[in-house]
């Protein structure tokens, strides 16, 4: 409906934002993210195949409503209110996902046990800079956010359409003809949202770690898990504490570090999750213009409460370009 309402906007969106126009289940997008196997895209045993998604493939959605509250009763009442309003106006609910912070010692952690959401970018114009904490990156003149050591301030255009971006403060006006820009004015101050419902197989993760341990006993399961993630379960960076989990909570160290002294990945492997998604090396391609704003919401009970239940992470992210910031480039 959106495309039919404005054919000019539809053409421009398809040209500039191809993956958004195609949708997440399109072969190009699904293959490069690993949802489909490049060598066997129709594998019936592939649990990540878009055909098995709860939404986003055959169950296309046009909007997502996010309702949050610390009061379960208030939350339930608001959900019912919105459902009634949707029914009144002929809006069909495709899927409802409940999620909440995990209880007890897992508070702030995801189902595999690792502390989540530690490293987030700050946004220029929203987060004041710390005059006493400049970034070591010469390309980051805005420095670190006040009260958040290691949190670099990123230009708002990396998350909000129509604002200046890291590589070109004049974007988009200098890169496209005025007629092109004017047709996209309705998108200004908006953002592209990526939603992924990620199931987590806790038993499989634990078994995989155990089976991969070196036979000589030089590494235990906690250390191998930390090598894969780049942090111990407490959130302590393995670069700061390579031998054991020290439960580091100091803001000046838990996120304020680089891999400058570990170029070969001897402390934090180069394949570690946090190093792949945010290299922290100031000369890395796309280190600043590939940042996204992430929000993770666990769903399902902790594994130790009900091993058979479905569980995972409801991943939500905001960005200026799905192709440029979320989807990896084709190999």
Give the role of each language-model region.
Residues 1-331:
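Long, low-complexity, Ser/Thr/Gly/Pro-rich intrinsically disordered segments that act as flexible linkers
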């Amino acid at each position: 409906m959106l495309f039919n309402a404005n054919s000019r906007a539809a053409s421009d969106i398809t040209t500039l934002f191809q993956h958004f126009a195609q949708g997440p289940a399109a072969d190009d997008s699904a293959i490069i993210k690993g949802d489909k196997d490049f060598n066997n895209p129709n594998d019936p045993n592939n649990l990540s195949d878009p055909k098995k998604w709860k939404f986003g493939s055959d169950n296309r959605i046009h909007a997502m409503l996010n309702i949050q509250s610390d009061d379960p009763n208030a939350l339930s009442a608001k959900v019912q209110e919105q459902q009634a309003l949707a029914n009144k106006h002929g809006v069909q609910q495709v899927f409802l996902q409940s999620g909440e912070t995990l209880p007890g010692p897992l508070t702030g952690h995801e189902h595999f046990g690792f502390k989540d959401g530690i490293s987030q970018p700050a946004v220029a114009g929203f987060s004041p800079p710390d005059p006493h904490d400049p970034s070591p990156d010469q390309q980051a003149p805005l420095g670190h956010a006040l009260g958040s050591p290691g949190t670099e301030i990123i230009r708002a255009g990396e998350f909000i359409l129509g604002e200046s971006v890291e590589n070109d403060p004049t974007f988009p006006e200098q890169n496209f003809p005025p007629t092109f820009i004017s047709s996209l004015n309705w998108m200004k101050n908006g953002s592209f949202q990526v939603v992924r419902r990620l199931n987590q197989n806790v038993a499989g993760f634990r078994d995989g770690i155990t089976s991969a341990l070196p036979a000589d006993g030089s590494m235990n399961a906690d250390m191998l898990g930390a090598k894969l993630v780049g942090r111990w379960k407490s959130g302590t960076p393995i670069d700061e504490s390579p031998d054991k989990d020290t439960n580091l909570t100091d803001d000046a160290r838990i996120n304020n570090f680089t891999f400058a002294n570990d170029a070969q990945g001897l402390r934090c492997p180069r394949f570690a999750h946090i190093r792949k998604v945010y290299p922290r090396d100031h000369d890395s391609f796309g280190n600043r213009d590939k940042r996204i704003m992430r929000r993770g919401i666990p769903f399902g009970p902790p594994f130790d409460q009900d091993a058979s239940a479905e569980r995972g992470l409801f991943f939500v992210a905001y960005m200026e370009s799905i192709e440029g910031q979320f989807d990896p480039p084709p190999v």
